[in-house]
């Protein structure tokens, strides 16, 4: 073997070597050479033989060593014998198929006659051949098993006679050659055989009894079987029996396995046309016919009946109310209404209608309505209610801010549910209730999902939900969200246990639906419960889970339970959120308000439910819900419902816990078991709640009401009364929802002090409060609870437990894919953009920074993290889900109050605050965004009705947010616009419907404003907001725009301080809760009406502050917030954007205007920053109002720009680039620098020439704006570019940039470096960091990199400084950079105010920088300057407390954050 070993590897080489060496070594011995050669050859062949033998037998182990020749030969002989024996056996049995391991012999050929039957027998389908004409040439006999047709019936018939119409095209593609059918799916070469697999629906032969029926009936009864066809097209060369089979399609059709069956669309829809009187003129059900879902005729019939029927407690039917809305707004979404089919299937429906006008005369001609239906199908009815698509659109308005809505749009049942909830509030229109639910539910924004996820978490299904929508429910983002998660538990328990109509499977589906479904499930279950208050009561008594589930019957109790239950660690906020979420689900549908709906809603939020029952909008929803649910409940039996509630509630209870949420979240069924783990505590909680409920509702009358509700009597009102009623059930005054609303608001305000109390205290107190207050009050209380708890959570009253819950939630979020799906969603975004630790740290920081603003500050921080993330995502959702759904926002406005009180405070405390003055409605709208999202939605929904709830809603929100106060009022008006901001075009229509007062500017603000900015604005802008509460809805829309509107929202200051008090003296979380409560109470009283707000503003000197220092304040806050936001979340743009907007806003006394201005100016910035989310395009929100001013400003700016065309072009280009390619940096920083430098020189010359003139103009305009107040500023704020922005979200930025750039030029003139900065802004658009460095002014002003950071944050800020285009940014950078320099600081302040004023006028902005230096120095500048440095020094401020006096600090913070960002 030695020879073999030596040479086998390369015998040829060995032989050559041997020839050369042999003569020398061995001598001339031919014999020896021959022997060696033979040996080598022998070794070689044996080795090859070994390889063949062992390789053939896959005896790989034998390759590890070299076998000896004997072994190899032995194995070879053995194998040859085996082969011969096998051949003999095969010869004996010719028909026997050869063994697979025998490869040496030829394949056995099966006789063709035997092969056919064998194949057919083995086939899992039938075989058919279709020729080029589409005729069936052959079909196998077994077709009868599948289609009931005989072979003879199909032979030589057209295949299209049995194919569904919708599949003809696909079949033709497969039948005809690629050359004939363009875009054919064949991928193989034409001459080769091609195979393809496709699905098609084939007609099943009708049964004999149906053949006699008429054609129509027969068509209706047609049944199609979805078959999977494997088709092979034969090449031309194949001919058989003279027949050309070249174009034949040979197919094998088999039934699609259940697991492979495509998921049927979760929603169905049909369209109707109505005349202007609302009478149906035509009905189109073709889409439902094509869907082939059984019972669609009954579905259409019952939907129309439900929509047009007048329900108890309602003055008009859904159809009538909706028709009026359509005629008024041009586009409207109805509230979600529910009904049941003849088979008991629950259906959630929503109608979207559009007014069609004549193209020539523009006169209304008719109304086209799309009715979207979602069947329950063993899932929580809420899911059907939500009908991913059906609810999605309506929800979109609300949901536009909320991932839940997005989910809904996506059509996930779970998500649908959540969306449904959201919509309910906007649709329900109970301002308080709706807004609140929105706030809580939508307030969740991302939280919405959180609540959905977390709420669903309790339900086994719900957790599955969570898997789908973790980002939605990012709990970390919203400490209050954890409550939301708990709330889902509530839902879960009703869904799983409490809803006879909706069996656990329902919940399971809900769970699978996703977190939103969880919410929906909750609602669905709630419905079950709602039908009987008694059941709900019992459920509550039986367990927290039930309380959540049965919270339908007693939302308040549910809240209480959540709070009481172990889940309460974080649950107090979660409870609130959950309660809201649960209610939201129902609220969305609005039906819960009635009967089952009432209970469901009540379970979610007592107050809210009441609101639903309120005459506003909820009644309709509630009645529907009550109808559908009551039917289900009645059909299944109250007893069963009660049993479900009692039994499942225990299981579900644990789910409220954060851990339970996480666990349940992980598996949809897990929720039940998870809740089971918490069963003991939940039982205790249940008993406590029941005890309290009994105590609170000690009167037999209350119990009787509950019983009546349980029995389905007076369900709507009673359920709402009982629903809040576990605790407040009895006390609820179902009869007077409005009164309750006010009472609830009052109660919330009065109980505001609990807000600051530690979470543990708050939970019981809130619970108690809930029980004590009226149903409306309960709802408010719940909202308050949420907010208070959230507040306390934010401040870190219970950092340990809250953090634990938060961590769990964050884990869930991080583990789920939702964050990826909804990176922008509040919950998801926080999880995605900021790691869990960062969020927790922020939360801790908030608690640690218990500065006067702590409640707000903490909230802000949390919001900054969660809301900013949420906000950004939400706008994205809004844009994606509800781009054209301004109407939904309007709908949302109907229930602004609901949102107001929501936890959003903690979630997006700034947002929350904003909605407060605006109304809960605002929050309702902004709710999705977080609080802001809810607010926004609520505002939109309640915009029109908002006057009715203003003070009440404000009060609750104010108390809840504590900082919101009057300022939010105007915000609320604007939320509609903000809500529409997602869909700028739609936004504008929306705005009219909400409130004339609402600033379109606001929308613009909303669009531009990022969560961070919103938060930042909480400080200074608060005043502005408050100053213009009536008109200044703009700030709310900002909030609503979860986009990067934080900055804008910050303008409002609302988010920051609900009350002027907060603004003036930062609402210190440090202050005792009682003090804060007292302040809130006072604020509530003061803000009860707009006059009071205005008086307060005047007393506080807010108008002056707003015009002067506030502008700066907002900027500072904006910068800080922006910085924080940037630090916390990936998108730097929001910060930059926010900071700039904030400055502008801050300077503008009117928040709207500043917001608008910021939007206008910032749009380019926003665009730059918004690259990651071009959908935000805040400028698109700018409305027509400011058009004149904007146009004037634009003309001025353009005139100036004409001198500097290059710069202007660049700015425009940058904006355009951002818009077109948001992800791509606009231009290289170097280019921007070069341009900036050149333009700086040119512009400096022009500016110096015009400097004095421009400054004078700017000053005059600033004064004018201040004098005019916020009303004027919005129009002014909206530059000409802005209006364009409003109309076209993408263009707006370019327009805004256009406008801002002229100001930039002006600013450029002012400071040389600044001007470079102006060019730089263009560069920052492309490369903010470059912009900073490029802008000498910026760098100079901020000698330290910190300033550059603001510049980075305000990448444009420098540019703005250079060119007043972005006053807010410019001024904030100055402040931040030169916080120490009082002159600069002053300059910045003036700049800010001027910026806001010149927001609409670029030229003014240009001068602003210069003028600012001179005039702004006067008031806030010096103060701000000093403040700025101080705050900058305080890292805590950076973290969470960005208050009015922190503007410079904010800038500094921005600088720090930006610098870090820049230089990292």
UniProtKB/Swiss-Prot annotation:
Region of interest (CASP8AP2-binding), ranges: 691-743
Motif (LXXLL motif 3): 745-749
Modified residues (Asymmetric dimethylarginine): 338, 864, 874, 1173, 1177, 1190, 1196, 1203, 1221, 1240, 1266
UniProt entry tagged with the keyword Nucleus: yes
Motif (LLXXLXXXL motif): 1079-1087
Annotated segments matching region Disordered: 1-40, 468-513, 557-683, 709-737, 973-1003, 1017-1038, 1051-1074, 1441-1464
Composition skew (Low complexity), residue ranges: 638-648
Site keyed Breakpoint for translocation to form KAT6A-NCOA2: positions: 869-870
Residue ranges annotated for the bHLH domain, each copy included: 26-83
Alphabetical list of Gene3D superfamilies matching this protein: Helix-loop-helix DNA-binding domain, Nuclear receptor coactivator, Ncoa-type, interlocking domain, PAS domain
Keywords tagged on the record: Acetylation, Activator, Biological rhythms, Isopeptide bond, Methylation, Nucleus, Phosphoprotein, Repeat, Transcription, Transcription regulation, Ubl conjugation
BP terms from Gene Ontology: cellular response to hormone stimulus; cellular response to Thyroglobulin triiodothyronine; circadian regulation of gene expression; locomotor rhythm; mRNA transcription by RNA polymerase II; negative regulation of smoothened signaling pathway; negative regulation of transcription by RNA polymerase II; peroxisome proliferator activated receptor signaling pathway
Motif (LXXLL motif 4): 878-882
Pfam families assigned to the protein according to its UniProt record, in alphabetical order: bHLH_NCOA (PF23172), DUF1518 (PF07469), DUF4927 (PF16279), NCOA_u2 (PF16665), Nuc_rec_co-act (PF08815), PAS (PF00989), PAS_11 (PF14598), SRC-1 (PF08832)
GO cellular component: chromatin; cytoplasm; nuclear body; nucleoplasm; nucleus; protein-containing complex; RNA polymerase II transcription regulator complex; transcription regulator complex
List of residues that carry Phosphoserine: 29, 487, 493, 499, 554, 565, 682, 699, 736, 771
Record's comment describing the protein's domains: Contains four Leu-Xaa-Xaa-Leu-Leu (LXXLL) motifs. The LXXLL motifs are essential for the association with nuclear receptors and are, at least in part, functionally redundant.
Protein name, entry field: Nuclear receptor coactivator 2
Species, as recorded: Homo sapiens
Lineage: Eukaryota, Metazoa, Chordata, Craniata, Vertebrata
Gene giving rise to this polypeptide: NCOA2
């Amino acid at each position: 073997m030695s020879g073999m070993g030596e040479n086998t590897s390369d015998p040829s080489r060995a032989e050559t070597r041997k020839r050369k060496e042999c003569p020398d070594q061995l001598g001339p011995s031919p014999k020896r050479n021959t022997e060696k050669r033979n040996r080598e050859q022998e070794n070689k062949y044996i080795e090859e033989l070994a390889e063949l033998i062992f390789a053939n037998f896959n005896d790989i182990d034998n390759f590890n060593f070299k076998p000896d020749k004997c072994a190899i030969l032995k194995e070879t002989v053995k194998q040859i014998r085996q082969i011969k024996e096998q051949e003999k056996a095969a010869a004996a049995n010719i028909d026997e198929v050869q063994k697979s391991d025998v490869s040496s012999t030829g394949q056995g050929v099966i006789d063709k006659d035997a092969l056919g039957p064998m194949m057919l027998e083995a086939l899992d389908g039938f075989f058919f051949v279709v020729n080029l004409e589409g005729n069936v040439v052959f079909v196998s006999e077994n077709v009868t098993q599948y289609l009931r047709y005989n072979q003879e019936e199909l032979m030589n018939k057209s295949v299209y006679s049995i194919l569904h119409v919708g599949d003809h095209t696909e079949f033709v593609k497969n039948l005809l050659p690629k050359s004939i059918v363009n875009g054919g799916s064949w991928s193989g070469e034409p001459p080769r055989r091609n195979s393809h697999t496709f699905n098609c629906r084939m007609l099943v032969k009708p049964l004999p009894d149906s053949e006699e029926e008429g054609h129509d009936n027969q068509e209706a009864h047609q049944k199609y079987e979805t078959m999977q066809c494997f088709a092979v097209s034969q090449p031309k060369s194949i001919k058989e029996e003279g027949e050309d089979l070249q174009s034949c399609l040979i197919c094998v059709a088999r039934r699609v396995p259940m697991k492979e069956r495509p998921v049927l669309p979760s929603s169905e829809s049909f369209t109707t046309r109505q005349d202007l009187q609302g009478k149906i003129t035509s009905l189109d059900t073709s889409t439902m016919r094509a869907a082939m879902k059984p019972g669609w005729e009954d579905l259409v019939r019952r939907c129309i009946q439900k929509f047009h029927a007048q329900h108890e407690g309602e003055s008009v039917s859904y159809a009538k109310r909706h028709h009026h809305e359509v005629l008024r707004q041009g586009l409207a979404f109805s509230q979600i209404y529910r009904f049941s089919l003849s088979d008991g299937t629950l259906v959630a429906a929503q109608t979207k209608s559009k007014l069609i006008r004549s193209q020539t005369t523009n006169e209304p001609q008719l109304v086209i309505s799309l009715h979207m239906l979602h069947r329950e199908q063993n899932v929580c009815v809420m899911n059907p209610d939500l009908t991913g698509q059906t609810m999605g659109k309506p929800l979109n308005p609300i949901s536009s801010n909320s991932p839940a809505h997005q989910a809904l749009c996506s059509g996930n049942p779970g998500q649908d549910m959540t969306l449904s909830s959201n919509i309910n509030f906007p649709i329900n229109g109970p301002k308080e209730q709706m807004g609140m639910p929105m706030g809580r539910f939508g307030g969740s924004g991302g939280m919405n999902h959180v609540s959905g996820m977390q709420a669903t978490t309790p339900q086994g299904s719900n957790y599955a939900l969570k898997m789908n929508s973790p980002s939605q429910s990012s709990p970390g983002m919203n400490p209050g969200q954890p409550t939301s998660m708990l709330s889902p538990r509530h839902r879960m328990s009703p869904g799983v246990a409490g809803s006879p109509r909706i069996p656990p499977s329902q919940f399971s589906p809900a769970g699978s639906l996703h977190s939103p479904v969880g919410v929906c499930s909750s609602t669905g279950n709630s419905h079950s419960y709602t039908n009987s208050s008694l059941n709900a009561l019992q459920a509550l008594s039986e367990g927290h889970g039930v309380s959540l589930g049965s919270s339908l019957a007693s939302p308040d109790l549910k809240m209480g339970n959540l709070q009481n239950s172990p889940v309460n660690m974080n649950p107090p906020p979660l409870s609130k959120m959950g309660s809201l979420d649960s209610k939201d689900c129902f609220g969305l549908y609005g039906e819960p308000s009635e009967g089952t709906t009432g209970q469901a809603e009540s379970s979610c939020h007592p107050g809210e439910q009441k609101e639903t029952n309120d005459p506003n909008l909820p009644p309709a929803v509630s009645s529907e819900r009550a109808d559908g649910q009551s039917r289900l409940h009645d059909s299944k039996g109250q007893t069963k419902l009660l049993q479900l509630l009692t039994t499942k509630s225990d299981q579900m209870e644990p789910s409220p816990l954060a851990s339970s949420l996480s666990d349940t979240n992980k598996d949809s069924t897990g929720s039940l078991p998870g809740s089971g783990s918490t069963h003991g505590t939940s039982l205790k909680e249940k008993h406590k709640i029941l005890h309290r409920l009994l105590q609170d509702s000690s009167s037999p009358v209350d119990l009787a009401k509950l019983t009546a509700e349980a029995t389905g009597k007076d369900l709507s009102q009673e359920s709402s009364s009982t629903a809040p009623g576990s605790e407040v059930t009895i006390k609820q005054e179902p009869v007077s929802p409005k009164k309750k609303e006010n009472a609830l608001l009052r109660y919330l305000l009065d109980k505001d002090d609990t807000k600051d109390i530690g979470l543990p205290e708050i939970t019981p107190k809130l619970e108690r409060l809930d029980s004590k207050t009226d149903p409306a009050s309960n709802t408010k209380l719940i909202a308050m609870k949420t907010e208070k708890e959230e507040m306390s959570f934010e401040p870190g009253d219970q950092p340990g437990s809250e953090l634990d819950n938060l961590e769990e939630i964050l884990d869930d979020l991080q583990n789920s894919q939702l964050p990826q799906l909804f990176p922008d969603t509040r919950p998801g975004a926080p999880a995605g953009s900021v790691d869990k630790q960062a969020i927790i740290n922020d939360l801790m920081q908030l608690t640690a920074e218990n500065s006067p603003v702590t409640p707000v500050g903490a909230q802000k921080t949390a919001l900054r993290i969660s809301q900013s993330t949420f906000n950004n995502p939400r706008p994205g959702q809004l844009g994606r889900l509800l781009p054209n759904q301004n109407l939904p926002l309007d709908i949302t406005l109907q229930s602004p109050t609901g949102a107001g009180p929501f936890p959003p405070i903690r979630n997006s405390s700034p947002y929350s605050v904003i909605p407060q003055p605006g109304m809960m409605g605002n929050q309702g709208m902004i709710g999705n965004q977080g609080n802001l999202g809810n607010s926004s939605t609520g505002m939109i929904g309640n915009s029109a009705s908002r006057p009715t709830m203003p003070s009440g809603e404000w009060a609750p929100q104010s108390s809840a947010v504590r900082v919101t106060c009057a300022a939010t009022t105007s915000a609320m008006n604007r939320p509609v616009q903000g809500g529409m901001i997602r869909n700028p075009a739609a936004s504008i229509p929306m705005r009219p419907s909400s409130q004339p007062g609402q600033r379109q500017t606001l929308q613009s603000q909303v669009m531009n404003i990022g969560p961070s900015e919103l938060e930042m604005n909480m400080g200074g802008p608060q005043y502005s907001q408050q100053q213009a509460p009536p008109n200044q809805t703009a700030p709310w829309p900002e909030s609503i725009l979860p986009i990067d509107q934080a900055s804008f929202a910050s303008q409002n200051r609302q988010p920051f301080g609900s009350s002027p008090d907060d603004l003036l003296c930062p609402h210190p979380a440090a202050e005792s809760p009682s003090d804060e409560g007292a302040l809130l109470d006072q604020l509530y009283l003061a803000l009860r009406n707009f006059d009071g707000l205005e008086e307060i503003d005047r007393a506080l000197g807010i108008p002056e502050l707003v015009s002067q220092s506030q502008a700066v304040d907002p900027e500072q806050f904006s910068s800080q917030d922006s910085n924080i936001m940037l630090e916390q979340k990936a998108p730097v743009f929001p910060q930059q954007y926010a900071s700039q907007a904030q400055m502008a806003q801050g300077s503008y006394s009117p928040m709207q205007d500043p917001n608008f201005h910021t939007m206008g100016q910032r749009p380019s910035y926003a665009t730059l920053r918004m690259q990651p989310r071009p959908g935000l395009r805040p400028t698109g929100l700018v409305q027509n109002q400011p058009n004149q001013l904007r146009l004037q400003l634009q003309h001025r700016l353009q005139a100036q720009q004409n001198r500097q065309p290059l710069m202007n072009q660049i700015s425009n280009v940058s904006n355009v680039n951002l818009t077109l390619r948001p992800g791509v940096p606009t231009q290289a920083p170097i280019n921007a620098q070069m341009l900036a430098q050149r333009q700086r020189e040119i512009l400096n010359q022009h500016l110096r020439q015009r400097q004095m003139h421009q400054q004078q103009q700017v000053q005059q305009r600033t004064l004018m704006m201040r004098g005019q107040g916020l009303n004027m500023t919005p129009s002014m704020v909206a530059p000409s570019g802005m209006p364009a922005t409003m109309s076209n979200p993408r263009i707006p930025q370019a327009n805004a940039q256009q406008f801002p750039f002229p100001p930039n030029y002006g600013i450029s003139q002012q400071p040389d470096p600044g001007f470079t900065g102006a060019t730089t802004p263009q560069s920052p658009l492309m490369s903010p960091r470059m912009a900073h460095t490029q802008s000498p002014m910026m760098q100079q002003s901020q000698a330290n990199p910190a300033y550059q950071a603001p510049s980075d944050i305000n990448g444009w800020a420098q540019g703005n400084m250079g060119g007043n285009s972005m006053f807010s940014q410019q001024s904030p950078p100055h402040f931040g950079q030169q916080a120490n320099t009082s002159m600069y600081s002053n300059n910045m302040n003036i700049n800010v105010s001027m910026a806001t004023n010149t927001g609409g006028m670029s030229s003014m902005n240009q001068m602003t920088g210069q003028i600012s230096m001179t005039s702004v120095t006067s008031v806030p500048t010096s103060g701000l300057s000093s403040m700025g440095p101080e705050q900058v020094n305080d890292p805590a401020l950076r973290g969470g407390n960005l208050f009015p006096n922190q503007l410079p600090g904010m800038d500094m913070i921005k600088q720090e954050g930006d610098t870090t960002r820049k230089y990292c």
